[in-house]
Amino acid sequence: MSWRLGTMIKDALALTGKTRPRVCLVNTAMGDNLTYYAISYEAFNEAGCDVTEMKVFPQPSADPEERLCGSDLVWVGGGSVANLLALWRLHGIDDAMRSAWEQGVILGGVSAGSLCWHMGGTTDSFGQILQPVTNALGFLPYANGVHYDAEAQRRPLLHQLMRDEVLGPLAYATDNTVGIWYEGTEATTVVSDSDVDPESGPAAYKVEFVEGEIVETRYGVGSSFA
């Protein structure tokens, strides 16, 4: 099994401004799966990075504050966001992530590694029927919808949770292979790991609950939210 870094991660590495970026991998949501760490290490090493990890199984692999704040990029893998959040809080990784963010470390990730930075969103952490998660870190003061085009429950549940005020009135959602750059807490640009048609391909969405109605605006890859 092998993996090559996609455009989004390569762009994140470029944003560090370092010739050899220090990358910290965090795969809590997958139970610190060793195979996933191995293929991730290989991919980032081939890209010229110094790679470390922040594990919690079977015990923390480093002091969270020291490890995360000493990185240029923290990349969080997918899996169970509910388990991720519980374990991060148990081990103080949540506070260390905030310290890293406030110090300018680039934070990113996929699936659970996207949801965790927001207020909450939809998750399969509890089973095949999707449920809300509302206790994410909240660095980004919006709800988040991941796998928006790939799982039939995702879009309608996000809309319903916003109508019911379980989630807030503003969310950002992404189809598979698509991501959103944030500068501080402001959504700026839509990016993708694939060569997709901005008009018809996978996209990002700004979802708003306004005067009792859901208003969803599509942003193709390369678009700006400004």
Give the ranges of each region predicted by the language model.
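Short gly/pro/ser/thr-enriched loop/turn and capping motifs at secondary-structure boundaries
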Residues: 82-83, 114-117, 180
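An acidic, phosphate/nucleotide-engaging active-site surface
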Residues: 70, 83-102
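Portal/gating segments that form or line small-molecule/metal binding sites
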Residues: 24-26, 30-83, 87
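C-terminal and late-domain segments of enzyme folds
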Residues: 1-18, 25-38, 42-46, 121-123, ...
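Catalytic nucleophile loop
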Residues: 75-78, 97-120
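Hydrophobic anchor at the start of a short beta-strand
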Residues: 51-52, 107, 202-206
